[in-house]
From Swiss-Prot:
Catalyzes the ATP-dependent conversion of 7-carboxy-7-deazaguanine (CDG) to 7-cyano-7-deazaguanine (preQ(0)). The gene is queC. It comes from Methanosarcina mazei (strain ATCC BAA-159 / DSM 3647 / Goe1 / Go1 / JCM 11833 / OCM 88) (Methanosarcina frisia). Its EC number is 6.3.4.20. This is 7-cyano-7-deazaguanine synthase. GO terms for molecular function: ATP binding; ligase activity, forming carbon-nitrogen bonds; zinc ion binding.
Amino acid sequence: MKAITLLSSGLDSVAALAIAAESLEIEMAITFDYGQRAGQREMEYSEKVCEHFGIEQRIIKLDWLGEITHTSLVNRDEEVPSLSFEDIDENSPSMITEYSAKAVWVPNRNGVMLNIAGSFAESRGCDYIVVGFNGEEAGTFPDNSRDYIQAVDNAFSYSTQNGVKVLAPLAEMGKTEIVKKALEAEAPLEYSWSCYHGGEIPCGKCESCVRRARAFKNIGIKDPLLERLGI
């Protein structure tokens, strides 16, 4: 069975790739550049991840998506919310995380990316598109949910001749379990970039950084990325 993977270089997409690669032939990785704050880091780190797995990478620019996005993930004039461990619950969203999700929302981003990936998957005879959608974030990002995945699969049954499907190995997992599974699969987490910002080091305060930090704290090991960066 063959697959294409969506790779942002974030914790979830790197973990999903590593897990899927244990049982599937990964044809290529697609990375999107839509003007996101962390774009430079994501391109740099995703290239390292592809080298690790020995797979082809295709970088696709979506300038128009950045142009129509007014939230802080792209718009440098808007502030990215800062959170703490106390603000986040693995099992249910809070008012703070719902606010944070709205502050970084990109219009129909996952829908656009999946449909582009669907074209590549069909053209290459691939059965699956591997994604890092996960259970923890599904509460605040509905386009991470099982219902969304099923809806996309249904659409692909009409729009692709080979019935491409979305494969989300992390769909039922929280971040702590994701880290455990990623380490078991020997994922190159030292080259996974979760931060919404694109600095030399992760900010440690955005929602993505906080969720990641809490997961490593829960299992009692140092984040391989921070170790590599000497933090």
